[in-house]
Amino acid sequence: MTELARLKFYATQPHPCSYLPEEQATTLFLDPSQPMDTQLYASLSEVGFRRSGDHLYRPHCQHCTACIAARIPVADFSPNRQQRRILKRNAELQVIRKRPSFNEEYYDLYRRYIEQRHADGDMYPPSRDQFATFLVRDLPFCCFFEFRLHGRLLAIAVTDVLPNGLSAVYTFYDPDEEQRSLGRYAILWQIAETERLGLQAVYLGYWIKNCRKMNYKTQYRPIELFVNQRWVALT
């Protein structure tokens, strides 16, 4: 924490919250002039920071503490019955690690995902510029995990590979393959990959108790939440 105390951070002005419409949000950003090296990012992930594009951020709201960083300690994870079914259903998928890049195959999948799954969100309507700015970043720790079935692209898990674990940045998938539960499968695969790499945890971003879209995160047990400057197991 001593090194982190020397860093500069900037807070945004209050703005409408994307998850709790009745709330005003404030976000704390790492000084964008600070080089985002892998070790610094890992250290900040340990205190609840996330990456979006080229920025590291954390909620910094004055009157709300609903957004809580969440991670899965993979050594203790055991899939439940439903999760085992999802793993079996997708066992034939091939996963390929790629450097982040823009191509029409990726963008078409992203566009259809946003249009059919998140037309009510602040990422709608999708655009090529939005896709490139948000996800296609030339960072040494970032990769695209492609999930393919007989060559056909079904999903991409945008993932940061850090010394302390995998950070699940964003996953988008074929909305016509709903029966496969590809979003859940991507997390299960990231858990297995984290363990294979000998790393500690999968960082899932923020969990909000009263946000329906966030409920899926607590289906992975055990899960730890960053509360009062320390990680505690959710019971």
UniProtKB/Swiss-Prot annotation:
Keywords: Acyltransferase, Cytoplasm, Transferase
Cystine pairings recorded for this chain: none
One cellular component (GO) term of this entry: cytoplasm
Main location group: cytoplasm
Pfam families: ATE_C, ATE_N
Enzyme class (EC, first level): transferase
Documented EC number(s): 2.3.2.29
An example molecular function term from Gene Ontology annotations: arginyl-tRNA--protein transferase activity
Regions annotated as coiled coil: none
BP GO terms, sorted: proteasomal protein catabolic process; ubiquitin-dependent protein catabolic process via the N-end rule pathway
Location(s) in or outside the cell: Cytoplasm
Signal peptide annotation: none
InterPro entries for the chain: Acyl_CoA_acyltransferase (IPR016181), Asp_Glu_LeuTrfase (IPR017138), N-end_Aminoacyl_Trfase (IPR030700), N-end_Aminoacyl_Trfase_C (IPR007472), N-end_Aminoacyl_Trfase_N (IPR007471)
Catalysed conversion reaction: N-terminal L-glutamyl-[protein] + L-leucyl-tRNA(Leu) = N-terminal L-leucyl-L-glutamyl-[protein] + tRNA(Leu) + H(+); N-terminal L-aspartyl-[protein] + L-leucyl-tRNA(Leu) = N-terminal L-leucyl-L-aspartyl-[protein] + tRNA(Leu) + H(+)
Role according to the record: Functions in the N-end rule pathway of protein degradation where it conjugates Leu from its aminoacyl-tRNA to the N-termini of proteins containing an N-terminal aspartate or glutamate.
Similarity-based family: Belongs to the R-transferase family. Bpt subfamily.
Designated name of the protein: Aspartate/glutamate leucyltransferase
Organism (species): Pseudomonas aeruginosa (strain ATCC 15692 / DSM 22644 / CIP 104116 / JCM 14847 / LMG 12228 / 1C / PRS 101 / PAO1)
Recorded name of the encoding gene: bpt
